[in-house]
């Protein structure tokens, strides 16, 4: 972006190119504001941040431009306002309600901008995050769905590498009770109230030495999510969590992939 917060036209063209790849394959595509948030970003959730109004204005200008650029795309293109927005202390959970309310405010800004746009945007499906996209009970409880001009077009997304010690490779064991607990919270806080939920990121770091255990974990995770009607998206980052080699289009862990596809 330039000094006037205008997105580089070549960048938008590249995003469009990738979006078109996805849609041309008959898939649904999600665009979000990604690493503008997080530990290395510029947009933070701090209630006492003197820079917030400037950050919020920049956030709004991004979505005004993106909404207009893609306004005539079909409902197969979904917008997601944020990704794992943190405070400046980089806390991933256990933050105050006031901090979560900053995220709620940004989510409302996002919805308002898209709905005031033209084309297919007034009815487009929009995805929202909790603080840090956290599946912790406190952050989910302090999340508030924005007001919208149309019904049943908002979806909550959380990220859940659960249990984190296993998913990050720190431990080679896990407890299914950890998975049961956070999904039960998702159900009680949102799904029972007819709010749709997706797990926008999940996964486990890959290596063949514990492939059987990881396949077992993924199978249980997805089966549990399926009982609540939750769709899950593996975080294939091309790095530690990758399950597909993008250079030669081959599966790195076909046993794991086959097991997940069987559940899905």
Please describe what each predicted stretch is.
Residues 12, 43, 64, 93, ...:
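Short linear interaction motif-like sites in intrinsically disordered regions of transcription factors
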Residues 29-31, 197, 232:
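Hydrophobic beta-strand scaffold residues
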Residues 40-41, 208, 242-243:
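Short secondary-structure boundary/hinge segments and terminal tails
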């Amino acid at each position: 972006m330039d000094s006037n917060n205008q997105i580089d036209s070549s960048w938008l063209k590249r995003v469009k190119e990738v979006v078109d790849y996805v849609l041309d394959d008959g898939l649904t595509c999600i665009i979000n504001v990604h690493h503008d948030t997080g530990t290395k970003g510029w947009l933070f959730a701090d209630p006492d941040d003197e820079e917030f109004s400037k950050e919020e204005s920049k956030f709004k200008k991004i979505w005004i431009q993106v909404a207009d650029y893609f306004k005539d795309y079909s409902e197969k293109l979904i917008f997601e306002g944020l990704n794992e927005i943190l405070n400046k202390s980089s806390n991933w959970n256990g933050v105050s309600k006031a901090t979560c309310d900053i995220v709620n405010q940004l989510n409302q800004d996002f919805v308002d901008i898209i709905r005031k746009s033209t084309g297919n945007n007034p009815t487009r499906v929009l995805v929202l995050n909790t603080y840090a996209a956290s599946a912790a009970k406190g952050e989910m409880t302090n999340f508030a769905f924005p007001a919208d001009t149309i019904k049943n077009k908002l979806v909550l997304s959380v990220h859940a590498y659960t249990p984190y010690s296993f998913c990050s490779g720190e431990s080679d064991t896990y407890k299914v009770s950890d998975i049961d607990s956070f999904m039960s919270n998702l159900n009680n806080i949102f799904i029972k109230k007819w709010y749709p939920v997706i797990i926008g990121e999940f996964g486990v770091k890959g290596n063949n030495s514990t492939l059987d255990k990881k396949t077992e974990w993924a199978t249980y995770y997805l089966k549990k999510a399926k009982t609540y009607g939750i769709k899950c998206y593996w975080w294939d980052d091309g790095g530690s969590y990758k399950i597909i080699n993008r250079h030669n289009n081959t599966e790195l862990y076909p046993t794991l992939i086959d097991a997940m596809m069987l559940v899905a």
